[in-house]
Amino acid sequence: MFRKKKSRVLQRDVNFGNCLEDMNLQITNDFYLRKLNAPNELYEFQVTKDKEYNEKFYFAVLDHVYSWTLQNSLLTRISIPLESSPSEPHSWIYATRNWQTNENGIVIIIQSMSHPLIWSNRNLREGDVRRATVLDVIAKCTEKKLSVVIFSPSALLWDQSINFPRTTRYFTSQGLQITKKSIIKDVETPESYVSIGLNYVMSNSVSTKIHFVGSEYGSYLLNSYLDLNWKKFSGKAGAILLIMNMSINEELHDPDYVSYLIEHARNYLPSHEPCRHLMNSIMTESGIPNFSAGKYIDEFYDYIGDVLLEMIALDTNTSKS
């Protein structure tokens, strides 16, 4: 007679402290994530042979880096749906504090389905934390007196135990059940989250120039929204930076928007060519110029702030001429 093997239930009471130091980690003075007692050593997610513990450790690190980024970037969080109470299911968009009143320009960033405010987990482990997160982009934009609004379409599930929006991967890794109480009303999908958030931002910003960044799946969300609303916002549009653009010509219905993309957008794709080089031999179906993002997409995130400002400068000079 066979006995049913007991399945281990994930314990939710693992406490990793309130900061990276409690996990024997630190962000060094030169902005690298390293071990607290060995600042020259990379941190490791695989800290034990216990896979479940490692998953908890992994997300605890991401949460602490998220909090560090939020604090150092001075971003404010805007609840989506709007005016939700802290205990009601909601997600967030993130904005620099003068985004409504700044007339100089605004940059709207739609992230991929990565952890909120973090571009690349690989870069987080190996590179400058400011560039692995959105902090470097924000610093470069605000230095040019541009406001920034960031969308994180991955965190659309509500963890009612701590009243916090989470990613699907987080729920899976922690053994959490997705129930009706996990669903955030009105923003059940990334599309609805982006649509509600962008409608709010576009209606409340006084800026006459809006620049856009769409990263990976975020490029699809951005294109879908602008294609549908192009006649309303075309007069304010500036540079459009796409990373691994996922939209094809058949999905874009406004010919004026397609024409604008061809003239004003860039799409960055992984390739063996040097990072940031124009790939003349390859064009997307919509005709957007493709540039090399380097061998791995993570490589490009180190340069995203520089590329964005370069595109904004070109757009500004074109507008003046």
UniProtKB/Swiss-Prot annotation:
Name of the molecule in the record: Argonaute-binding protein 2
GO biological process assignments: regulatory ncRNA-mediated heterochromatin formation; siRNA-mediated pericentric heterochromatin formation
Keywords: Cytoplasm, Nucleus, RNA-mediated gene silencing
Keyword Amino-acid biosynthesis part of the UniProt annotation: no
Domain of life of the organism encoding this protein: Eukaryota
Keyword Cytoplasm applies: yes
One GO cellular component term noted in the UniProt record for this chain: nucleus
Function: A member of the argonaute siRNA chaperone (ARC) complex which is required for histone H3K9 methylation, heterochromatin assembly and siRNA generation. The ARC complex contains mostly double-stranded siRNA. Inhibits the release of the siRNA passenger strand from ago1 together with arb1.
UniProt cross-references to Pfam families, sorted A to Z: Arb2
